[in-house]
Amino acid sequence: MSEATIDSMLKDLPFPSNILNTLREDVLKAGVSKKEMEEIIEKMMEEYATSCIEPCDAAGVVAAQSIGEPGTQMTMRTFHYAGVAEINVTLGLPRLIEIVDARKIPSTPMMTIALSKEHPEDYAYDREKTRALAWEIEATKIDHIADVTTDLSQMKLIIDLHEKAMEGRNITIDQVKEKFNEELNVLVSISPDIDNQIVITPGEPSYRELLQLAKSIHNVTLKGIEGIKRVVVRKEGEEYTLYTEGSALRDVLQFEGVDKTRTSTNNINEIYEVLGIEAARNAIIKEATDTLREQGLTVDIRHIMLVADLMTCDGEVKQIGRHGISGEKASVFARAAFEVTVNHLLDAGMRGDVDQLQGVTENIIVGQPIRMGTGDVHLISRRVEKVEAKELEAEEE
């Protein structure tokens, strides 16, 4: 059987991608016929039907233990070289905690910038274009292109620009001067005697002002995007890709040559702000799955999807914690059982809250059967024949 035939037969099957990929590889190795393939698929569908979730099953508890148990095997290492020698990225348990805590800014924000590749001369295939785009995106500070010295006798800052560094980053002395004029309330002038030298004089001739100014000029972004500390060009297969240390999705998507459909960031809140809640949900699933897979752990994607759905179901990204999902539960006992127990009970008592005892935690606390499995099944009516039989027995007596 050809690969195209196998793909067409597997296309509409309701199985996770990792199972389909394994099946595809095994079928190609074994060289099965079309009839045998149909029998394999039929057997798989039978197994699939028997493995579906039972009514009233505790899906949330199963998801929690399915993610939590592999989580105990994850390493505590924070940094790892993600195939790019110059860029560190947080992985393992610290990264998983960041994802479920919905941190506003990850500890190592990073972007993967895919480049346009529709035509042979596009950015993805041209190293020079890619390198030029990298310099446009990377934040250029004065330290990258110049030496700064403080002249205390003249009360001035002297900036000696490096011509080669300026050429590489495609920036001119006039642009540097203009940027300092915009950002700082000082007198900026180009030295008439020495090439590529800028002289900055503070507004007030005092040592304090001069030292403050010497500190401030290092924070001015002369070119590129604020927050993108470094950009690395890497060739993957036939095309070039950019990896950044720092993240600014909205700004990066504005650049010509960036493929908007394939560019991503590991900052989930930024994805939510730029692309919306559905994109954020997909990012949570992808980041959690990739983090677990990198550690050699396989968790069924449906458990992770359940967590992602819960974090995004209200239209914004919420953490799983007392400031998010756990702190917003309707049940007083469920909130109290998680964290800051006394505060929750006191507040509920003052407000006169009523707990309907619908969930698992609150029923366990008060000693009632939980509403899961057989505990969630109630007798609604009795069969008429049995009722009539009992009535006849009562009459005979």
Swiss-Prot record:
Keyword Transcription: yes
Any one of the GO BP annotations: DNA-templated transcription
Keyword DNA-binding: yes
Catalytic activity reported: RNA(n) + a ribonucleoside 5'-triphosphate = RNA(n+1) + diphosphate
EC supergroup of this enzyme: transferase
GO cellular component: cytoplasm; DNA-directed RNA polymerase complex
Enzyme Commission identifier(s): 2.7.7.6
Pfam families: RNA_pol_Rpb1_5 (PF04998)
Main localization, broad class: cytoplasm
Protein name in UniProt: DNA-directed RNA polymerase subunit Rpo1C
